UniProtKB/Swiss-Prot annotation:
Primary gene name: NRXN2
Annotated function: Neuronal cell surface protein that may be involved in cell recognition and cell adhesion.
Species this chain originates from: Homo sapiens (Human)
Extracellular side: 51-590
Stated name of the protein: Neurexin-2-beta
PTM info: O-glycosylated; contains heparan sulfate. Heparan sulfate attachment is required for synapse development by mediating interactions with neuroligins.
Transmembrane segments: 591-611
Native organism taxonomy: Eukaryota, Metazoa, Chordata, Craniata, Vertebrata
Cytoplasmic side: 612-666
Length: 666
């Protein structure tokens, strides 16, 4: 049959299509240009923007150490006059011969702690020695920044916790009565200073070398090890970086004994235009001494030549763009709850300053960053040395002993935490803001945003280099202590993970179940209460025992005076006063000891039982052999012996028959 023919049954001719060569596949269509248009547009826009920026900005340092503690200062040169934007030099004050002082004071609850600062001011004077501007930290910290004139030249001295760092411009004489513009920036321990059109003077203190390699290496260092690295660097003499808790800006130098005489215009510090605030009679600004407001235009002391020189200098000089540590407002002692949600005044989009201590305040002891979702403690510490006079927590009523839930040390997860709306009160102020445990009625949250530790906000802000010395290490879990409000019965949850071992939470806190494999079935009747509660439904059929003193205390409520509380100074306690460590191995060690004792007891019982059975088996075989020998002897005995055995009931008929037979034969 030909290849293209049909079969005898009239089948269709399908083989020809299979037998012939396959046609070549069609060429792929050209890629559409429409998806590539956005990319091309972005490239064009980027090139145009780069050309525009390069025409107006020239960068001296492009290294931005976002992860470095003390990287070089990012400097952006702005050709537009800074103090003359809008055609004027800003608000101008004249300081008289008797000296004057303008003081801007931050509210106690809004004092910023910054890693980077910038200061710009215009002035004219004939003095060869005076203090223009000084920024001081809170009392007892010792951080400061001072702009002064010494021997006719401008200099800046500052200290952020390590040593005094000085930077000056010896080539520019500013005591000539002309208008000069000074720009200063600080990034950690590094600083730059520029006077008019002179080149930027940079200062890198000792201990700041290899910053680029450190910044690259820091990106690969695990977050939980960051503090260890910082400690090592600090021991090696690394410069501290945070200007802690800035309290006041003072202009005029009258308080320093070196009063300034002349004109000051358009002072700018970290987004604050202090002279403008003084002209507006801001409540945070106080003025004293021989002071006169000139206005927002150039002062009458400026000649036409001086003004022209100033404009040219401003066109040629640079503006150093810096940023400050990103932080949210914190609540310190005595702060009203509503200040939690208040925003810090920002007059410049390049600056974000706030009252919360940043991630590395180096000079203090404790700090409370905002809560995030990072590392947290399996070891919870709570100071219970000063118990409140009034009960702040309700007792914990345990469930039946078989299902007794206690926290074992895996760490509470988000399932055990209430939603953020429930965690934070409507007023906005966190419970741990600045109040003691006695008057705290809001959740105590153990967490960390950048550091992830347990924080106590009743203490001043701290730096991350010193913070870890007073608190234990952290893990990646979050634990929330519930609000200390009385509740009639506990709200037990059975679907969450567990928290720190041996930690007994308040009844309103979720009480999660034990994880799989963690339940102790050998010791079910061991609740964690000193005495059983007397409320309705409380179990009273067992004798409670006191757990080992390895957990933070829980304040007892009225009617429950025997709830256990931590007593760091009591016998058998370990650790510093006020901090009680929860040790993970306590439950496992107890279980291991109980298991060993039970196994030993079981082995002893098995051995005794075996010995008993072996002894009984020996005695039984002896009796059987003896009785068997007795039966065989009785069968072989004569008639006299048989007659002695006649009283036996089963032997009587046979013996009588034998006797009868004997009588018959006789």
């Amino acid at each position: 049959m030909p290849p293209g023919g049909s079969g005898p049954g009239g089948c269709p001719r399908r083989p020809p299509a299979l037998a012939g060569p396959l046609p070549p596949p069609p060429p792929p269509p050209p890629p559409p240009l429409l998806p590539l248009l956005p990319l091309l547009l972005l490239l064009l826009l980027g090139a145009a923007e780069g050309a525009r920026v390069s025409s107006s900005l020239s960068t001296t340092h492009h290294v931005h150490h976002f992860h470095s503690k003390h990287g070089t200062v990012p400097i952006a040169i702005n050709r537009m006059p800074f103090l003359t934007r809008g055609g004027h030099a800003g608000t101008t004050y004249i300081f008289g011969k008797g000296g004057a002082l303008i003081t801007y004071t931050w509210p106690p609850n809004d004092r910023p702690s910054t890693r980077m600062d910038r200061l710009a001011v215009g002035f004219s004077t004939h003095q060869r020695s005076a203090v223009l501007v000084r920024v001081d930290s809170a009392s007892g910290l010792g951080d400061y920044l001072q702009l002064h004139i010494d021997q006719g030249t401008v200099g800046v001295i500052f200290n952020v916790g390590t040593d005094d760092i000085t930077i000056d411009e010896p080539n520019a004489i500013v005591s000539d009565g002309k208008y000069h513009v000074v720009r200063f920036t600080r990034s950690g321990g590094n600083a730059t200073l520029q006077v008019d059109s002179w080149p930027v003077n940079e200062r890198y203190p000792a201990g700041n070398f290899d910053n680029e390699r450190l910044a690259i290496a820091r990106q690969r260092i695990p977050y939980r090890l960051g503090r260890v690295v910082d400690e090592w660097l600090l021991d090696k003499g690394r410069q501290l970086t945070i200007f802690n808790s800035q309290a006041a800006i003072k202009i005029g130098g009258r308080d320093q004994g070196r009063p300034f005489q002349g004109q000051v215009s358009g002072l700018y510090y970290n987004g604050l235009k202090v002279l403008a605030l003084a002209a507006e009679s801001d409540p945070n600004v106080r003025t004293e001494g021989h002071l006169r407001l000139v206005g927002e235009g150039p002062s009458v002391l400026l000649s036409a030549e001086t003004t022209a020189t100033t404009l040219l200098a401003d066109m040629a000089t640079t503006i150093m763009e810096t940023t400050t540590t990103m932080a949210t407002t914190t609540t310190r002692r005595g702060r009203s709850p509503t200040l939690r949600d208040s925003t810090t005044q920002n007059t410049d989009d390049l600056l974000v300053a706030s009252a919360e201590c940043p991630s590395d305040d180096e000079d203090l002891e404790e700090c409370e960053p905002s809560t995030g979702g990072e590392l947290i403690l399996p070891i919870i510490t709570e100071d219970s040395l000063d118990p409140p006079p009034v009960a702040t927590r309700s007792p914990f009523v345990p469930p039946p002993p078989t299902f007794y839930p206690f926290l074992t040390g895996v760490g509470a997860t988000q399932d055990t935490l209430p939603p953020p709306a429930a965690r934070r009160p409507p007023s906005g102020g966190p419970c741990q803001a600045e109040r003691d445990d006695s008057d705290c009625e809001e959740p105590i949250e153990a967490s960390g945003f950048a550091s992830g530790e347990v924080f106590d906000s009743s203490l001043p802000p701290t730096d991350d280099e010193d913070f870890y010395t007073t608190f234990p290490l952290v893990t990646d879990r979050t634990t929330l202590l519930s609000p200390r409000k009385p509740a009639p019965r506990p709200n037990l949850r059975t679907d969450g993970a567990t928290g720190a071992p041996g930690v007994l939470f308040a009844p309103s806190a979720p009480a999660p179940n034990l994880p799989a494999g963690k339940m102790n079935h050998r010791d079910p009747l061991q609740p964690l209460l000193e005495n059983p509660p007397l409320g309705p439904g409380a179990p009273t059929s067992f004798e409670p025992r006191r757990p080992p003193p390895l957990r933070p205390g829980v304040t007892s409520a009225p009617g429950f005076p025997h709830l256990p509380t931590a007593n760091p100074t009591g016998p058998g306690e370990r650790g510093p006063p006020g901090a009680v460590e929860v040790i993970r191995e306590s439950s496992s060690t107890t279980g291991m000891v109980v298991g060993i004792v039970a196994a030993a007891a079981l082995c002893i019982l098995i051995l005794l039982y075996a010995m008993y059975k072996y002894r009984n088996r020996d005695e039984g075989s002896y009796q059987v052999d003896q009785s068997r020998n007795y039966i065989s002897n009785s069968a072989q005995s004569n008639g006299a012996v048989v007659k002695e055995k006649a009283p036996a009931a089963p032997k009587t008929p046979s013996k009588a028959k034998k006797n009868k037979d004997k009588e018959y034969y006789v």
